[in-house]
Amino acid sequence: MKAWVIGLLVICAVVIAEPVESRNYIEYGAINKCAGPNPPPGCNPPGTEQKNPTPVNEYSRGCSKIHRCRRD
């Protein structure tokens, strides 16, 4: 019985230890957080990657009429 179990374990070890092909690079999909399920906030919806993002706020130098600073 012991010899049978040891033989079975040896066969399993040989099958598991078989060489496996590996890649030398990481795919872009593994790095891109927006491509996976449940993307974080701020990711564009699928199909809009090439479009320019819409600005959230208009650009402002920090000057207003109240401050009387030079305006463009």
From Swiss-Prot:
<feature type="signal peptide">
    <location>
        <begin position="1"/>
        <end position="17"/>
    </location>
</feature>
<feature type="region of interest" description="Disordered">
    <location>
        <begin position="37"/>
        <end position="60"/>
    </location>
</feature>
<dbReference type="Pfam" id="PF05498">
    <property type="entry name" value="RALF"/>
</dbReference>
<feature type="disulfide bond">
    <location>
        <begin position="63"/>
        <end position="69"/>
    </location>
</feature>
<dbReference type="GO" id="GO:0019722">
    <property type="term" value="P:calcium-mediated signaling"/>
</dbReference>
<keyword id="KW-1015">Disulfide bond</keyword>
<dbReference type="GO" id="GO:0048046">
    <property type="term" value="C:apoplast"/>
</dbReference>
<keyword id="KW-0372">Hormone</keyword>
<comment type="function">
    <text>Cell signaling peptide that may regulate plant stress, growth, and development. Mediates a rapid alkalinization of extracellular space by mediating a transient increase in the cytoplasmic Ca(2+) concentration leading to a calcium-dependent signaling events through a cell surface receptor and a concomitant activation of some intracellular mitogen-activated protein kinases.</text>
</comment>
<feature type="disulfide bond">
    <location>
        <begin position="34"/>
        <end position="43"/>
    </location>
</feature>
<protein>
    <recommendedName>
        <fullName>Protein RALF-like 12</fullName>
    </recommendedName>
</protein>
<keyword id="KW-0964">Secreted</keyword>
<comment type="similarity">
    <text>Belongs to the plant rapid alkalinization factor (RALF) family.</text>
</comment>
<dbReference type="GO" id="GO:0007267">
    <property type="term" value="P:cell-cell signaling"/>
</dbReference>
<keyword id="KW-0732">Signal</keyword>
<dbReference type="GO" id="GO:0005179">
    <property type="term" value="F:hormone activity"/>
</dbReference>
<dbReference type="InterPro" id="IPR008801">
    <property type="entry name" value="RALF"/>
</dbReference>
<dbReference type="GO" id="GO:0040008">
    <property type="term" value="P:regulation of growth"/>
</dbReference>
